[in-house]
Amino acid sequence: MSRYRGPRLKKIRRLGALPGLTRKTPKSGSNLKKKFNSGKKEQYRIRLQEKQKLRFHYGLTERQLLRYVHIAGKAKRSTGQVLLQLLEMRLDNILFRLGMASTIPGARQLVNHRHILVNGRIVNIPSFRCKPRDIITTKDNQRSKGLVQNYIASSDPGKLPKHLAIDTLEYKGLVNKILDRKWVGLKINELLVVEYYSRQT
């Protein structure tokens, strides 16, 4: 299944706020409040909805998300929490959380177009996994810095998660540590996502 490129408002009406996909938020009284049949179909719908929220927020294909679930399942810690950590430490998401892009798709474009460096080296892979003490910067030219300047200036420092830091004058971000669960940028029940995939096998 390919990455979603359709109407974003349609998705947030169905799934709720997806800050990684769009800054828009669903209006009250949207499709989220529709009534559904109880029982197994309702439980399946809830698990599917949580899985879709995760996929569209981080801009993943179904195959990519499934691969992350498999990796997380091999860890000795909670599969759900490891899954969220893997997704949150992606370079495109780190740029988004630093405020260097307004959405994850926007951050992905910065990476694809070779505007971003990690520890002084160009990285053009959005799924690149960042780690503690990584330094994220733009290329040292006017065009690259101009692409993130407005986003950094308009970002709210109070919303910066504790595992990240940013120097707004140098356009430089720092990964301090692996994030804690409470700093995940999406309202999600990751256990339902893991349960969804466990029932598919």
From Swiss-Prot:
PROSITE patterns: RIBOSOMAL_S4, S4. Residues 89-157 form the S4 RNA-binding domain. One of its GO terms (cellular component) is small ribosomal subunit. SUPFAM superfamilies: Alpha-L RNA-binding motif. The keyword rRNA-binding applies. It is found in: Plastid, Chloroplast. One of its GO terms (molecular function) is rRNA binding. Its main location: plastid. CDD domains: S4. It comes from the Eukaryota. Pfam families: Ribosomal_S4, S4. PANTHER family: 30S 40S RIBOSOMAL PROTEIN, SMALL RIBOSOMAL SUBUNIT PROTEIN US4M. Belongs to the universal ribosomal protein uS4 family. HAMAP family: Ribosomal_uS4_B (MF_01306_B). This is Small ribosomal subunit protein uS4c. It comes from Triticum aestivum (Wheat). The lineage of its organism: Eukaryota, Viridiplantae, Streptophyta, Embryophyta, Tracheophyta.
